[in-house]
Amino acid sequence: MKKIDLNADIAEGFPFDESLLQLLSSANVACGLHAGGAKEMQSAVKFAKENKVRIGAHPSFPDRENFGRTAMALSSQELIAHLRYQLGALKAICDGEGAVISYVKPHGALYNQAAKDEKIARLIAQTVYQFDPNLKLMGLAGSLMLRIAEEEKLQTISEVFADRHYMPDGSLVPRSQPNAMVESDKEAIQQVLQMVTKGQVNAIDGSLVPVKAESICLHGDNQHSLQFAKRIVEELEKNHIKITA
């Protein structure tokens, strides 16, 4: 039986976390610098533990104004400090709830920059390894960030996206472009099944791009995305694909 992990971002202040956590096998907990805060983090950890969902830290650039989606030119020391601050905050909450952090997935612009920028990717990997060498790093399948993480002796999780279109090089179509998102639920489900069962995805130019699908990113920031997440779960189960971290 094939297996796949389902992850989504939580503790970002949206009202669907509890419902979403009943569908997921992994939860990316926002650490307060792009959205959410201590209260949201603690609730998310509590719900994740109750639902036996694997917990990941979801650190970002310090950018609440733009939801962490704007690239920032931080010095190495600034980036390291912000990463340590966020990881430490989530660890303290997990310790208090008797839970553990299992992996780290950068958020938004930090995720996208690390997928292509060796310096940022290495700083993230080294900071995570120093914080806890047993943590895994989740990132875009086939990206530079995952290759650097493996060089830095971290285990990795290759992530694919249900609702994003892909470039021929395997990167995501930037959100600034009009065709960045997969708008049709039917198309997104077909894309998920193709990635999980065949290890490939159709790029926007029609070419087939190989992808290693270990975790599927879903979104749960509105009512439609929550319903879509339920449909993805149903389709995976219908195709005898087990959802597990």
Swiss-Prot record:
Assigned EC number: 3.5.2.9
GO molecular function terms noted in the UniProt entry: 5-oxoprolinase (ATP-hydrolyzing) activity; ATP binding
Top-level EC class: hydrolase
Catalysed conversion reaction: 5-oxo-L-proline + ATP + 2 H2O = L-glutamate + ADP + phosphate + H(+)
SUPFAM superfamilies, per database record: Glycoside hydrolase/deacetylase (SSF88713)
Family the UniProt entry places it in: Belongs to the LamB/PxpA family.
Protein source organism: Haemophilus influenzae (strain ATCC 51907 / DSM 11121 / KW20 / Rd)
PANTHER family: 5-OXOPROLINASE SUBUNIT A, UNCHARACTERIZED PROTEIN YBGL-RELATED
GO-annotated biological processes: carbohydrate metabolic process
A Pfam family annotated for this UniProt entry: LamB_YcsF
Domain of life: Bacteria
Protein name: 5-oxoprolinase subunit A
Function: Catalyzes the cleavage of 5-oxoproline to form L-glutamate coupled to the hydrolysis of ATP to ADP and inorganic phosphate.
Gene3D superfamilies in UniProt: Glycoside hydrolase/deacetylase (3.20.20.370)
The keyword DNA-binding is annotated on this UniProt entry: no
